[in-house]
From Swiss-Prot:
Reported effect, residue 296 to R: Strongly increases affinity for RHO by breaking the interaction with R-175. No effect on affinity for RHO
Name the record gives this protein: S-arrestin
Key words, A-Z: Acetylation, Cell projection, Membrane, Phosphoprotein
Notes on the domains: The C-terminus of isoform A interferes with binding to non-phosphorylated RHO. Interaction with phosphorylated RHO triggers displacement of the C-terminus and leads to a conformation change that mediates high-affinity RHO binding. Isoform B is C-terminally truncated and is therefore already in the optimal conformation for RHO binding.
PTM sites of type Phosphothreonine: 230
Role according to the record: Binds to photoactivated, phosphorylated RHO and terminates RHO signaling via G-proteins by competing with G-proteins for the same binding site on RHO. May play a role in preventing light-dependent degeneration of retinal photoreceptor cells.
Pfam families: Arrestin_C, Arrestin_N
Assembly mode: Monomer. Homodimer. Homotetramer. Self-association is cooperative. Isoform A and isoform B interact with RHO (via phosphorylated C-terminus).
Classification via InterPro entries: Arrestin (IPR000698), Arrestin-like_C (IPR014752), Arrestin-like_N (IPR011021), Arrestin_C-like (IPR011022), Arrestin_CS (IPR017864), Arrestin_N (IPR014753), Ig_E-set (IPR014756)
Source species: Bos taurus (Bovine)
Biological-process GO terms, alphabetical: G protein-coupled receptor internalization; response to light stimulus; signal transduction
Family, as annotated: Belongs to the arrestin family.
Annotated GO CC locations: cytosol; membrane; photoreceptor inner segment; photoreceptor outer segment
Length: 404
């Protein structure tokens, strides 16, 4: 008789307040924006009834946009803008209890009677988590969009930031991410031609990709066809992957960064042609110390990548999206001049494409892992980044003891 295959372990992320009054549990750190809908943040809060006696416990979701270093104050101008804030009271429960998710039901069963569920939703107009990579020598916070979940206990009905006791609160970063749509667009292709002085016929360039969407880490084959009907020599063919980042909220900053490049060894003499495929792989690993590269929002420095292409729901105002990211292939040809190297000219054309994550597993399949309550609890890691100043918390007694 064939043994049943055990259900896979499901990692549950948890974080506890310094005074041990509040512990928050989340089933994941990344929440998927499907364009038409966004996965809600469903989790639970475990409270110590003695420590929260007479208090209220809240959970909040904040989306914030930062532009540059917040420690630089110019005429009172704030370099942070909250794009969205939502808050729910979880203890004591208010109103009729809503439906719980399968994850919440399993956690309540495992953690006991002092566990309270919460559900926070994203509106459809919010940007995804993204940040511009600071240079190694930069200090302070860099430009980016991030999402923060906070759970806290307080006596006060006024839950302003400066009135929340830090020892009774926990803060953690999550990410809102997009994955590639299931339907591909048309195969990207571009053609261009140039007429040169003293040449009757043009130089033609055709560039094509095998598909519209590539996944992070996937090789991108670029087919280049050069038809040189001129009297000049095409001395160099260079293919680039360019990341185009547009900061649209506070300004109209526009960054174009090359994140991968390849060069053909062949030249194309007058009245000849060449077709060649060059393969490029844009990776963060090759761009880690370059300032201004857009990244998917960071939770831990080792688990991020180049920012995914932005997909905007129809009808949404682009200016509230914070940072827009797109990608293009650029092919540059260097053409000889009358005086050789001194008068060489460059011509180029671009082909847009999308760089994204593949679709995750079927949600119904993922839910099966909850049925046996096979949870593995993992402490929610604090940011290990130079730009983590705002999220840096005082150490717990246990952490302090470990440092001694």
């Amino acid at each position: 008789m064939k043994a049943n295959k055990p259900a896979p372990n499901h990692v549950i992320f948890k974080k506890i307040s310094r005074d041990k009054s509040v512990t928050i549990y989340l089933g994941k750190r990344d929440y998927i924006d499907h364009v038409e809908r966004v996965e809600p943040v469903d989790g639970v809060v475990l409270v110590d009834p003695e420590l929260v006696k007479g208090k209220r416990v809240y959970v909040s979701l904040t989306c914030a946009f930062r532009y540059g270093q917040e420690d630089i104050d110019v005429m009172g101008l704030s370099f942070r803008r909250d794009l969205y804030f939502s808050q729910v009271q979880v203890f004591p429960p208010v109103g009729a209890s809503g439906a719980t998710t399968r994850l919440q039901e399993s956690l309540i069963k495992k953690l006991g009677a002092n566990t309270y569920p919460f559900l926070l939703t994203f509106p459809d107009y919010l940007p995804c988590s993204v940040m511009l990579q600071p240079a190694p020598q930069d200090v302070g916070k860099s430009c980016g969009v991030d999402f923060e979940i906070k759970a806290f206990a307080t006596h006060s009905t006024d839950v302003e930031e400066d009135k929340i006791p830090k020892k009774s609160s926990v803060r953690l970063l999550i990410r809102k991410v997009q994955h590639a749509p299931r339907d591909m667009g048309p195969q990207p292709r571009a053609e261009a031609s140039w007429q040169f002085f003293m040449s009757d016929k043009p130089l033609r360039l055709a560039v094509s990709l095998s598909k519209e969407i590539y996944y992070h880490g996937e090789p991108i084959p670029v087919t280049v066809a050069v038809t040189n009907s001129t009297e000049k020599t095409v001395k160099k063919i260079k293919v680039l992957v360019e990341q185009v980042t547009n900061v649209v909220l506070y300004s109209s900053d526009y960054y174009i960064k090359t994140v991968a490049a390849e060069e053909a060894q062949e030249k194309v003499p007058p009245n000849s042609s060449l077709t060649k495929t060059l393969t490029l792989v844009p990776l963060l690993a090759n761009n880690r110390e370059r300032r201004g590269i857009a990244l998917d929002g960071k939770i831990k420095h080792e688990d991020t990548n180049l920012a995914s292409s932005t997909i905007i729901k129809e009808g949404i105002d682009k200016t509230v999206m914070g940072i827009l990211v797109s990608y293009q292939i650029k092919v540059k040809l260097t053409v000889s001049g009358l005086l050789g190297e001194l008068t060489s000219s460059e011509v180029a054309t671009e082909v847009p494409f999308r760089l994204m994550h593949p679709q995750p597993e079927d949600p119904d399949t993922a839910k099966e892992s909850f049925q046996d309550e096979n949870f593995v609890f993992e402490e929610f890691a604090r940011q290990n980044l130079k730009d983590a100043g705002e999220y840096k918390e005082e150490k717990t007694d246990q952490e302090a003891a470990m440092d001694e």
